[in-house]
Amino acid sequence: MNSKFIVIEGLEGAGKTTTRDTVVAVLRAQGINDIVFTREPGGTPLAEKLRDLIKQGIDGEVLTDKAEVLMLYAARVQLVENVIKPALARGSWVVGDRHDLSSQAYQGGGRGIDSQLMASLRDTVLGEFRPDLTLYLDLPPAVGLARARARGELDRIEQESLAFFERTRARYLELAASDASIKTIDASQPIEQVSASISQALAQWLTNQEPV
């Protein structure tokens, strides 16, 4: 089977780390052991610097919405061109913690940046490059935020209002409904059921992939 790019998406507290473990277990059960992990923003030296700026800000300066989204795309293209595409080209599978869908949901939905501008940015920066499969972990924002707060100190984006995350979730659901490559998982279930749902969705998807 040719290498694939699988992305895990969702709001804060949705359980992306646990999902990654489940995805890896399913892939390895299929004999897929050459797996590269990525996170966004981040994943290259420059992208990690941008991650710090996006997550923490700098010296109290107000970070405008457009500056934020441009930094996200700068970090993303560095990761795609320097890590993800080379990994796929050499036959590795890539499992990513967030990708472009996050920007479409958080900046397009949460921040309210024009959807045409967001689509134009995506197409200009990434061209036709897209994940092969996206697992979107859906849960009520209040539940996710409670989980995030229980982990400790919140970053700049995690401190946004509940209304911001409601708008973000709404955009996630809107985009997932119109894209067959996005599988929505109910992440409000007990962790065992979430893992079972992920395993089932991924296993079914794998059976539909062309062998090498």
Curated annotation (Swiss-Prot):
Keyword annotations from UniProtKB, A to Z: ATP-binding, Kinase, Nucleotide biosynthesis, Nucleotide-binding, Transferase
Reactions listed under catalytic activity: dTMP + ATP = dTDP + ADP
Matches recorded under Pfam families: Thymidylate_kin
Binding site for ATP: G10, L11, E12, G13, A14, G15, K16, T17
InterPro entries: P-loop_NTPase (IPR027417), Thymidylate_kin-like_dom (IPR039430), Thymidylate_kin_CS (IPR018095), Thymidylate_kinase (IPR018094)
One BP annotation, GO: dTTP biosynthetic process
Record bears the keyword Kinase: yes
UniProt keyword Transferase, yes or no: yes
EC annotation from Swiss-Prot or TrEMBL: 2.7.4.9
CDD domains documented for this protein: TMPK
MF annotations from Gene Ontology: ATP binding; dTMP kinase activity
GO CC field: cytoplasm; cytosol
NCBIfam families in UniProt: DTMP_kinase (TIGR00041)
Subunit structure: Homodimer.
Family membership: Belongs to the thymidylate kinase family.
Task performed by this protein: Phosphorylation of dTMP to form dTDP in both de novo and salvage pathways of dTTP synthesis. 5-bromo-2'deoxyuridine monophosphate is also a good phosphate acceptor.
The protein's name in its UniProt record: Thymidylate kinase
Encoding gene per record: tmk
